[in-house]
Amino acid sequence: MSWRIAVGSADGYAINEHFGRCGRFLIYEIEQDGTYSQIENRSCEWRRGQDGHDVNHLQTAATVLADCAFVLVGQIGPGARAVLYDNGIQAMAVQSPIELALARLALFLISGRESILH
């Protein structure tokens, strides 16, 4: 088993994008042994011209990120968080370097405690 994580980052180093304004998501995969790697750079072209708070827009975002278990962004509103949650995706507002956040999330996941989130 592995987990896919969508990370909102403007610079590829820090988690610093607002979910509704994110231009791309860096997709990482965390393996059962705690190792992780970036597997994709997913563009948010589908967002162009859309309001980040529109319900249809949020549902599109959830569909595009459906293969991800978690979304790590600098900021996220309650509406976006709820739509992602309803689609089985845990959203977390995190302000840290990507590597640090992924290392901590990997430790959490391999401990088996992710089940408390569902």
List each model region and its residues.
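Non-catalytic interface/targeting segments
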Residues: 1-60, 67, 86, 94-118
